[in-house]
Amino acid sequence: MAANYGVNFNISNGAASPIKVQSDTPIGIAASLKGASKEMIYTKAGYESADSFPIFAFSNVSKAKEFVNDLIKENNLQDFRLLDTLECINLQNVNNVIIVSFFEESEESENTLTNIVNAIEAFKKAKHKTGFSPDLIIAPYYSHEAGVKAKLESVASSMNITAIVDLYATNVGEAINTMEAFSSKRLIAAWPQVQILNTQGKYAYVPQSPIIAGLIAHTDGDKEYGFSDSYSNRVMNGVTGTEYFIEFINGFDCDAERLRNAHISTCILSEGYRSWGGETSHEDTIWQDLARVRTFDRIA
């Protein structure tokens, strides 16, 4: 039941229309653009030579979207997943640094997994290369892979930050069973995918991880000690549906409660589509509250 997790409330005298919140929570995204070579990316960024696949920081999500959109148009690319990921963050009305670690998607799945693992590892050097270090890291469309999830957990643990992973499952039972492989205060697991109107004007299902990252960043910046608040039970802006129906009956046993009890962050329909979760899978209940984990990270 919701009472098991406390109550979130907000008192506000702000504007009736949403405004962007300035947040000091950088989001790191490991991403690829099918058909984009490292030379294309470096050239677009104004560099003459290309070494390894780049990691770039953008002052806000609008700048990142502009860069990726221009890269797609100028090279006639057809992969809009990164653009949709950035739009998911943008829809949460947050103004924060975005760090993109690019990697090449190969025709061989093994090579792709190696490349994405290297892109996630690159977040450790983000401060040196970009001047910014991520507080949240995601790898949408790939984090359901066991090896990618493991790398996200490893890097998040070494950097004392939070990684958000997307589960692959076709029903509630499968999603819950997947959590047998989780036990970390550094990971938030999300399921199922949610529907948005994507950047191409079509309804599409996308991973929750960038939306949750945007919600956390927004919550952090909403007030002075926002990092001590939970992102749970907040409206997920831009969401128009879920890939699988999630039963939610407030105060009663239901899909949403079973998922949350299994430490899975989900999406419920209750006066809008809302996040429902915020617990890690750590074996010690003290560290199952993500807000507590992140508060100790800030003051340590």
Which role does the model predict for each range below?
Residues L82:
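Active-site-proximal structural segments of metal-dependent nucleotidyl cyclase/transferase enzymes
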Residues T85:
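NAD-dependent ADP-ribosyltransferases
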Residues I11-S12:
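Membrane-interacting alpha-helical segments
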Residues A3-N8, S17-S23, I27-S62, V68-I72, ...:
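A glycine- and small-residue-enriched flexible loop/hinge signal that marks low-structured segments
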Residues K73-N76, N93-N118:
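Acidic/glycine-enriched edge-of-secondary-structure segments
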